[in-house]
Design a protein with these regions (language model features):
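A short pocket-lining beta-strand/turn micro-motif at the edge of beta-sheets
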Residues: 241, 246-249, 266-268, 276-278
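Catalytic-core "active-site belt" of small-molecule-metabolizing enzymes
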Residues: 21-226, 263, 267, 275-284
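Intrinsic-disorder-associated, low-complexity terminal segments enriched in Asp/Asn/His/Tyr and depleted
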Residues: 10, 14-19
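A conserved acidic, glycine/proline-rich C-terminal tail/linker
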Residues: 231-260
C-alpha cells in the first residue's frame, strides 16, 4: 500500500455558496439510495428522471451526504477527482462539462491488485487511464492556474481509475454523475514517482491494454489541453464552494482516452511516456 502522508481534506462547503432546489430530507434520501445501490449492486433510474428539478448544488450536496455516510462507516477522505474532462469521454457519455468527486482510502488499491467486483460494490465498471497528482502545498481557488498546480505538486504518476455508475446503463446527465461522486469506483496509482517539471505532461501518450490487446490510447493534452489545467479547474470550482486543496491530497486529473468496460477475468495494463505504468485485474 502507498506510504505517503495524506492530509485530512476539507470537504464541508461554504453554506453561503449553496442554492438548492431540493429539501434536506430529499437529499438525504437520494444519498441513502446511492449508498444502497452500491452495497446491493443494483443501479438506480437517473436522479434527473425521478427528480427533474435537481441542479448542480443539489447534486453536490447529495454527494457530500453520501460521503458522510461512508466516513461514518470508517472510510477516510484522501483526495479528489475530476471526471469527464476529455472530449472523447464527454462524447461517449453525452455529458459536456467536467464533474468532480472525492476519493477515500477504501477506493484505493495497490498497483497490480486483483479487485473483487462484488466486494467493492462495482456494478458496471469502466477503466480510465489517467495522471495522478500528489500535492505538497495547499491550493485555494479561485484564481489557481495550471502553473500554480505544477508548483504545488510533489510528483505525478500513472493511474487507473475504475469508474462505476450507480445509475442504470450509464444514462447520466451532469447532475446524476456529480451526485454519484463523479461515478468514482476504485483507483490504482503506479509506483513510479516523477517530478512534473521533468517532462511535458501535455505531450505524453498513454497506451492501455486489456488482456494483452490494445484497448485505447490518448495524449495528455486530451485533458483540457493539459492535465494540470484540469486540476486547476477543480481547485477553482471547489474553491468557489469554500473547499481548498491540501498538501498530501492526491488528485486524479481525468481520462486520456475513452472508457473501456471491465468485467471479471479482465486484466488491464497501462503505460504513460516517462511516467511508467500500472495494472489491475478483476474477479467476481
Amino acid at each position: 500500500m502507498p506510504t505517503w502522508v495524506r492530509a485530512a481534506p476539507d470537504i464541508s462547503p461554504d453554506p453561503t455558496n449553496i442554492n438548492m432546489n431540493l429539501s434536506s430530507p430529499q437529499i438525504d434520501a437520494m444519498a441513502e439510495r446511492l449508498d444502497d445501490a452500491m452495497r446491493q449492486r443494483r443501479p438506480l433510474e437517473p436522479l434527473t428522471s425521478t427528480h427533474p428539478g435537481i441542479d448542480i448544488d443539489d447534486a453536490y450536496q447529495i454527494s457530500l451526504r453520501w460521503l458522510h455516510r461512508r466516513e461514518a462507516a470508517g472510510e477516510r477522505v484522501i483526495g479528489k477527482k475530476i471526471g469527464v474532462t476529455s472530449k472523447a469521454v464527454q462524447d461517449m457519455l453525452d455529458v459536456h462539462q467536467p464533474d468532480f468527486g472525492f476519493l477515500t482510502d477504501r477506493m484505493e488499491l495497490a498497483d497490480g491488485a486483483s479487485a473483487s467486483l462484488s466486494a467493492l460494490g462495482l456494478i458496471q465498471p469502466r477503466a480510465e487511464g489517467e495522471i495522478a497528482f500528489m500535492l505538497n502545498k495547499d491550493l485555494q481557488g479561485p484564481g489557481v492556474t495550471h502553473q500554480d498546480v505544477l508548483d504545488a505538486t510533489a510528483w505525478v504518476a500513472p493511474c487507473f481509475e475504475i469508474v462505476d455508475s450507480r445509475i442504470r446503463d450509464w444514462q447520466i446527465r451532469i447532475q446524476d454523475t456529480v451526485a454519484d461522486n463523479a461515478s468514482c469506483g476504485v483507483f490504482v496509482v503506479g509506483t513510479q514517482r516523477t517530478d512534473p517539471a521533468a517532462l511535458d505532461l501535455a505531450g505524453v501518450t498513454m497506451r492501455m491494454q486489456r488482456n494483452g490487446q490494445p484497448a485505447g490510447s490518448g495524449r495528455g493534452d486530451a485533458v483540457q489541453g493539459h492535465p494540470a489545467e484540469a486540476v486547476a479547474w477543480l481547485a477553482n470550482t471547489l474553491g468557489a464552494r469554500g473547499i481548498p486543496f491540501r498538501a498530501g491530497e492526491i488528485i486524479l486529473s481525468g481520462s486520456l482516452a475513452p472508457l473501456v468496460p471491465a468485467q471479471a477475468g479482465d486484466r488491464f495494463t497501462m503505460e504513460i511516456d516517462g511516467l511508467g505504468g500500472c495494472s489491475i485485474s478483476f474477479v467476481d
